[in-house]
């Protein structure tokens, strides 16, 4: 029989280790250590789980490469497993599962497809009851977005993450009751050869590219949400997975549509108000008169929800000045500036287990409105009369 891992009983208490640091209480409390340029994260117990969202807070400004501001990169079910004097960050694999009540069948699936252990977080403090304080650097200063691979695939050069030129971005590193937000500036340095034409045209010095990467941690949603199968006649985003608990005559491939949760205060009353309406916040960086037009366009959804019997289920507002648009609690309509015209993209971050949308992200390219205006003006004869 193997012995359990040895734990260091001399580990400092959490209070002693974080004395004098900027503390944020919340879902996963955190402390920012400015001297060591690191984030210390409190894990409440062994095998604690959370939703983990990854986004780019700032962009490269190039449509062909695609590393854009507010790009939602990934949504994971994360688990923090203690192993000796460290905590392992494990990403659970929800692409393969079993709906069968047979627990052994579910176990066979779980043991057939691996999770991903992506970071080891040293324990630096510990309190009675299993609460530990970890140095989250291995999680924070990680190329979650695959910047290096994207630049290489785009033939822009071989870039590597330069830890000595990367730092915690403290203004947007905070914790709240329902979420913990961690922001970091990551610098990617040219490791050899010449930089590509695109980055050479955009960067003041193409041998170094600094982007901000944002991590959001939230509690797993409760079981009150009911997944809905994606109708193939509807072109929309979905959670796709293989369900090995399906009957022999059924397909393993399952698709659940991504959608927001809407619940009435009184579920038995079809006229009862909506408990938590969907609110989309419009980026204040959108210039007028475009911002007013965007708000008017988004507000068309109000009538659609009302006509569906969901009165008051949808609102649109300006993003408050004090709010970071990367904050996972806010659905946002973001303004993207690029060096050339590019795509406007609708996306979301949600629960990989069910398809429930937690944060909607609509990204508008700033060139498109100019292009549309020029097309309209040309058709109306404005170009010839100017």
What are these regions (language model features)?
Residues 287-291:
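Alpha-helix N-cap/helix-initiation motif
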Residues 2-286, 304, 308, 313, ...:
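Auxiliary tRNA-acceptor-end handling modules of aminoacyl-tRNA synthetases
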Residues 292-299, 303:
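Solvent-exposed, polar/charged alpha-helical surfaces in well-ordered, non-transmembrane soluble domains
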